[in-house]
Amino acid sequence: PDDITSWNIEQYILPNTKEILFYILEQKDFWDTVQPMNGAVEALYRLVNDGYNIYIVTASDYRTIPAKLKCFFRLFPFIRQDQVVVTKEKQLLDLDVMIDDNPENLCHASYDKLLFDRPSNQWVDKEDLKRVYTWAEIYQFIKDNYPIRTVY
């Protein structure tokens, strides 16, 4: 929702309910209801078909990974398991481009940083971050700025 303006989820939930939240996120039926962002499937599919090597990097909590990845591969069947990296240290990866909606995941690295616009990151105003609003915009940025080669 638009009223969530921070990544600190604990400020939006009742005390002692964090475990309940993670329990919900661990459930397969929760992930059966998740839909990709508008244009995400099409943009990633086009980039893969154009010849780019795409890697998905997630900093998700380990408890949610099995159910989340099962959902992900259902929605993005053209992405292979070896194209998924699970790490909270995204800045350590040797990347060309990183797309994230959490600005903390884009700090302290040399790759191009695309900040996907969300209510939770409206406060961010950094010169080295390019704010993007749609997956079509992301697709065009990569096509315009990178010859076909590995893009992470």
Where are these regions (language model features)?
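Conserved phosphate-coupling serine/threonine residues in phosphotransfer and NTP-handling enzymes
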Residues: 58
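C-terminal cap/substrate-recognition subdomain and adjoining C-terminal extension
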Residues: 43, 50-52, 61-152
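Generic surface-pattern signal
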Residues: 9, 13-15, 26-30, 143-151
